């Protein structure tokens, strides 16, 4: 025995020649570690470690410690200590006890205040023989009504009045947070991998959950090695099926598959209602009891059965057979099964378990001591005419109804047998009785939960308001559906009252949260009056901190909120879950400082890989921009570059404030891996921080230009405006309403940058300023109803005028009149005059046959000398140019 100085950990080694060969340090306990030593009062009654090299050939190092946890984690079970044991050596898991093997770490929960004797013996590596002798000396003189029966071939005789141990131990499979005793459900686990066996023919398949989270207290294989010798207790409990209760009397002889039932203190009152109904027949009379149900039996050296189970199941398909032709099928329970026992097939001999409780009448013949069966089966009911093919060997019997004819040909027999086997494999779900209970576990329990959720939705709709007559019918229907759903879910009034309390004590594991939701039918629903009182508080929490939690329903990280509660002391309560929108509102209660700290932690919270919803590789995170950006203009995160750099998908919503600028204040939806989301989040935060730091030194200046130039400033698709903003590092936003024939806009940035932007804008206006005194520029007023005619489809007409006249023509607004426009023709005098003439002809002001030089104030053609037809002038000019070229 050796003890470490740093931590209160027992390290024991079997090899006395060498000291500690290997130490496996357990995980750091979250609360308190209780030191165990030889001077402890609790351990005075227990024998000291005595080693026997003949029995223990391989050195084994075990590390054990005890950790105290609050009782609120285990409501309904008086548990205050956890004993974590780990063992490690060089043995293979498929070898027997005599060879080298190893076992995985397991967690055991003790339901008493002190460590139990078997666990203490095993931690100290006390041999079996010395342990039994010592336990006989300690418990000598005690009176026990239930004598212990043991196998005389392998164990030396001890006093039958002495119990082997006083208290049972709850062993929960790792990981611990997935198997919480609070949320016990009567549906057990079953082993899925049944095709792997060790050297002794033992089935060590892994456990698998049936559909959803099902809690079960399971004794694992290697935790009771060398000290639990399968005593034949007369285990009597209300949770045991009454059809096998008589077979558990003290008169039954010891079998290697004898399994202890769970203790009465572990019974759950929620599941003490209707007893289970099996839908398969068990009539295996010729199966060897040492090899059947090997998944529930483990042998240490000298073939001592050392496993303890608390399950009820049975083989329902014979898919796998070992070398001896034994049935090693999967194990499954078809309906709610209370915590009972798993028995060997010999316990069910002479029994024929059929569809319903009414069809089975079991009784015990006290005179003969044998069990009989009485079976009722309706010949006319076609549902009961099912074929059950167990296997091809003679060890297990075939329970099926033969057809009227016999098949004489052996090949036809083989064909029919294979055909029945294929059909039996395909039929994984069937009807049990006339009420059409579905045997498929997932579909069966999903149907119950759907009915319960539908009843809750109907109650909500009823509360929102209907007609008086409709309300009554609706309420009656809701009450019936809810009552039936609660009966099927086996929920009592106490369970419904405890539903709120259970949902406030969230576990660290998301699977536990989902298990509670499935067990009790969703989170607690608050009344409308309570929601009105908390409306302001919830709105503030949603505005400031809950955008990070605005994740689709089902992917909300509820378990991480418990960490925030422990870190800040702020109490978080889930108020409502909206299915359509998928948003969940959380109420924060506590001191103002605690609420601020909780909000910061919620903002910084990123979804972990452990909380990926529906098994997807990508996760969703909502990034909320700071509130200071609401008063800014022209800020953009450049999401496209972030997507390429980080390898994620960003969906954003923009709030448009004007023509040129926008601000992304809505949350951004990021989809990708955890590392890429971390990288994108850091990039966005750095950009926003840099932008906000620069905003402190910026100012806003308003500037106005004539309304005829604002389109030139913006440019085609905003090209001119973007170049000005990029060069000057400013943000320019035009106002939508123009007053006094002026286009006003605001420029935000540093003082030097604002001056530079104004200079760029003045350059554009100066280049496009028309000179009225220039004889080479003509302006023609175009009415509003003629603008489309002058431009033409896709600008065909105005382009024709430009090509014929070789002048620059463009439309411009008229000061004081936003409807009519000017057609400005510039260039040479002849070209501009000809373009103005074509414009007037197009809009119908003049007749092409009549030349008017001094027509009206709509043009300034009076400055041009009287001439002939402008078309003749242009023809003469072109003829002269061609002549010169020749």
Curated annotation (Swiss-Prot):
GO molecular function term, any single one: mRNA binding
Bias kind Basic residues: ranges: 369-388, 415-425
Xref: PROSITE patterns: KH_TYPE_1
Keyword rRNA-binding: no
Composition-biased stretches (Basic and acidic residues): 359-368
Keyword Repeat: yes
One cellular component (GO) term of this entry: nucleus
Classification via SUPFAM superfamilies: Eukaryotic type KH-domain (KH-domain type I)
Coiled coil: none
GO terms (BP aspect): mRNA processing; regulation of alternative mRNA splicing, via spliceosome
Record keywords, A-Z: Repeat, RNA-binding
UniProt-annotated stretches for the region Disordered: 359-433
Every KH domain range: 698-761, 775-839
InterPro entries named in the record: KH_dom, KH_dom_type_1, KH_dom_type_1_sf
Signal peptide: none
Designated name of the protein: KH domain-containing protein hrpk-2
Protein's organism: Caenorhabditis elegans
Pfam families per the UniProt record, alphabetical: KH_1 (PF00013)
């Amino acid at each position: 025995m050796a003890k470490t100085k740093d931590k209160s950990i027992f390290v024991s080694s079997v090899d006395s020649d060498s000291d500690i060969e290997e130490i496996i340090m357990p995980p750091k306990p979250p609360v308190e570690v209780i030191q165990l030593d030889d001077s402890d009062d609790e351990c005075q009654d227990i024998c000291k470690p005595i080693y026997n090299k003949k029995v223990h050939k391989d050195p084994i190092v075990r590390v054990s410690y005890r950790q105290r946890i609050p009782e609120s984690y285990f409501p309904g079970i008086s548990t205050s200590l956890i004993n974590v044991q780990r063992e490690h050596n060089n043995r293979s898991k498929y070898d027997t006890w005599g060879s080298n093997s190893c076992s995985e770490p397991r967690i055991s929960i003790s339901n008493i205040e002190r460590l139990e004797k078997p666990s203490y013996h095993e931690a100290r590596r006390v041999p079996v023989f010395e342990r039994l002798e010592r336990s006989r000396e300690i418990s000598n003189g005690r009176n026990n009504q239930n004598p212990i029966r043991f196998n005389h071939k392998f164990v030396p005789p001890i006093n039958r009045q002495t119990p082997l141990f006083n208290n049972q131990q709850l062993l929960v499979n790792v990981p611990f947070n997935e198997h919480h005793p609070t949320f016990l459900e009567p549906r057990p686990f079953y082993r899925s991998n049944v095709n792997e066996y060790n050297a002794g023919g033992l089935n060590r398949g892994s456990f698998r959950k049936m559909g959803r989270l099902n809690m079960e207290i399971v004794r694992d294989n290697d935790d009771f090695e060398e000290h639990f010798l399968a005593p034949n207790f007369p285990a009597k409990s209300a949770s045991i099926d009454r059809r096998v209760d008589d077979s558990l009397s003290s008169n039954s002889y010891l079998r290697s598959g004898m399994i202890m039932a769970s203790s009465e203190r572990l019974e759950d009152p929620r599941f003490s209602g209707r007893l289970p109904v099996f839908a398969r027949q068990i009539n295996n009379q010729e199966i060897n009891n040492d090899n059947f149900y090997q998944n529930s039996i483990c042998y240490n050296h000298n073939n001592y059965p050392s496993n303890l189970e608390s399950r009820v199941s049975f083989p329902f398909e014979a898919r796998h057979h070992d070398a001896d032709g034994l049935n090693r099928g999967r194990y499954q329970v078809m309906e709610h099964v209370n915590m009972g026992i798993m028995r060997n097939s010999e316990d069910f001999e002479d029994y024929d378990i059929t569809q319903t409780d009414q069809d089975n009448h079991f009784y015990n013949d006290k005179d003969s001591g044998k069990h009989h069966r009485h079976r009722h089966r309706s010949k006319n009911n076609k549902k009961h005419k099912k074929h059950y093919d167990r296997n091809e060997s003679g060890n297990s019997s075939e329970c099926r109804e033969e057809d009227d004819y016999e098949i004489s040909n052996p090949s036809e027999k083989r064909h029919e047998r294979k055909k029945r086997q294929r059909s039996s494999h395909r039929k994984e779900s069937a009807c049990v009785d006339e009420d059409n209970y579905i045997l498929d576990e997932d579909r069966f329990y999903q149907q119950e939960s759907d009915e319960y959720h539908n009843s809750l939705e109907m109650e909500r709709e009823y509360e929102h308001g209907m007609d008086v007559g409709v309300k009554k019918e609706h309420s009656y229907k809701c009450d019936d559906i809810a009552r039936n759903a609660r009966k099927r879910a086996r929920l009592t009034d106490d369970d419904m009252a405890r539903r709120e309390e259970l949902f406030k004590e969230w576990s660290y594991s998301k699977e536990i949260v989902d298990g509670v939701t499935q067990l009790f039918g969703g989170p607690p629903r608050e009344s409308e009056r309570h929601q009105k009182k908390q409306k302001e508080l919830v709105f503030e929490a949603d505005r400031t901190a809950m955008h990070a939690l605005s994740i689709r329903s089902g992917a909300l990280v509820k378990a991480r909120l418990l960490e925030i509660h422990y870190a800040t002391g702020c109490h978080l309560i889930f108020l409502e879950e909206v299915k359509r929108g998928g948003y969940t509102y959380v109420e924060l209660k506590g001191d103002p400082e605690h609420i601020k700290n909780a909000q910061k932690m919620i903002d910084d919270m990123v979804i972990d890989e452990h909380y990926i919803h529906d098994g997807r590789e990508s996760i969703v995170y909502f990034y909320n921009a700071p509130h200071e950006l609401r008063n800014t203009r022209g800020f953009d995160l450049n999401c496209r570059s972030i997507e390429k750099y980080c390898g994620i998908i960003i969906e954003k919503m923009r709030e448009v404030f004007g023509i040129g600028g926008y601000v992304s204040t809505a949350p951004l939806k990021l989809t990708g891996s955890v590392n890429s989301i971390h990288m994108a989040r850091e990039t966005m935060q750095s950009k926003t921080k840099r932008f906000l730091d620069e905003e402190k030194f910026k100012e806003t200046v308003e500037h106005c230009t004539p309304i005829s130039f604002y389109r030139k400033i913006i440019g085609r698709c905003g090209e001119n405006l973007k170049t000005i903003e990029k060069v000057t590092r400013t943000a320019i936003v035009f106002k939508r309403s123009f007053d006094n024939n002026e286009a006003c806009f605001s420029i935000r940035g540093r003082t030097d940058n604002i001056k530079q932007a104004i200079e760029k804008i003045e350059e554009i206006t100066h280049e496009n300023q028309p000179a009225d005194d220039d004889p080479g520029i003509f302006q023609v007023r175009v009415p509003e109803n003629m603008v489309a005619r002058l431009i033409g489809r896709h600008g065909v007409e105005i382009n024709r005028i430009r090509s014929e006249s070789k002048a620059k023509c463009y439309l411009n607004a008229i000061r004081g009149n936003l409807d009519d426009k000017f057609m400005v023709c510039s260039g040479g005098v002849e070209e501009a005059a000809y373009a103005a003439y074509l414009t007037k002809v197009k809009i119908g002001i003049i007749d092409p046959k009549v030349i008017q030089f001094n027509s009206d104030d709509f043009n300034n053609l009076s400055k041009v000398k009287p001439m002939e037809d402008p078309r003749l002038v242009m023809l003469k000019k072109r003829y002269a140019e061609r002549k010169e070229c020749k």
